[in-house]
Amino acid sequence: YPENSFAEIAQFCRWRYISLSEYVELNEGPGIWDFLAEVWQTMKQAVADGLAAEGTLPGGLNVERKAKRLYAQSKENERPQVRELRIVCAYAFAVSEQNADNGTIVTAPTCGSAGVLPAVLLYMQRTHNIPDAQVLRALAVAGLFGALVKRNGSISGAECGCQAEIGTACSMAAAALCALMGLSIEETEYAAEIAMEHHLGLTCDPICGLVQIPCIERNAVAAKRAMDAFNLSGLLCGSRNISFDMVVRTMKETGLHISAKYRETSEGGLAKLYDRRAAN
């Protein structure tokens, strides 16, 4: 995109009286909607495939697929907040388990963080009967924020730790929720900033180098955190002090100072201390 920061994009949108999704269309052309329709269909299929699958994931860690069981584990008189948690997390598990089993997923922004965005969007669509066309607008906004992080920060766990992957996914999902539910540009920025800020410093230490532990569960937690960021942004936007651009720069600087042991090498953290014999 011609603008280099979110501040520049927001200023341009205000000047032209357009939304963030309209900004994306202005730069990408109308063909972007056909592309995003394919993206959305692939995301929904990944959730469906993951919810239908059972068994153990490949790789030797004996990680059981949990999405199907989680999705079906409703209880009588289940509280609404528990149901939301269960369904959103089941969707995130489904996509992440498909990724771990060489299934077809959409990088958002990476394979290891692919479960966050489809989980929150599909839950909101089904809960509020939102048409696909509106979801595509939200996907456009998610992609815009992901592109900004890629340009000014990093989306690579090998470069900046898991904050760069799951933190970006959480920001994209929070921004998408704002677009989906009609929040302002300022509220959208704030949600994306909250989502990234509270992943700062997160390490990438996959056990045995597999995108399973802690990666799959982390997608579910980040999906819920994106929903929290979305809700908070609508309540507190007027009193914020940190911009999205600032938190992205902070993430990049933080990531470059994280030891290489905690940047996808599996030489530190959980990957180092995990004892497969004790776990089994």
Regions found by a protein language model. Name each.
Residues 30-161, 269-280:
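Accessory "access/gating" subregions that flank catalytic or transport cores
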Residues 175-280:
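Functionally critical mobile loop/hinge segments
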Residues 90-94, 115-125, 140-148, 163-179, ...:
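Contiguous, well-ordered alpha-helical segments that form the cores/surfaces of helical PPI scaffolds
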Residues 1-26:
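Flexible glycine-/small-residue-enriched beta->alpha junction loops
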Residues 14, 25, 48, 52, ...:
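Generic surface-pattern signal
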Residues 107-108, 151, 157-160, 164, ...:
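Generic structural "secondary-structure junction" signal
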Residues 4, 34-42, 83-90, 100, ...:
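Conserved active-site and cofactor/substrate-binding residues in soluble primary-metabolism enzymes
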Residues 122-126, 153, 157, 168, ...:
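Amphipathic, positively biased hydrophobic alpha-helical segments used for protein targeting
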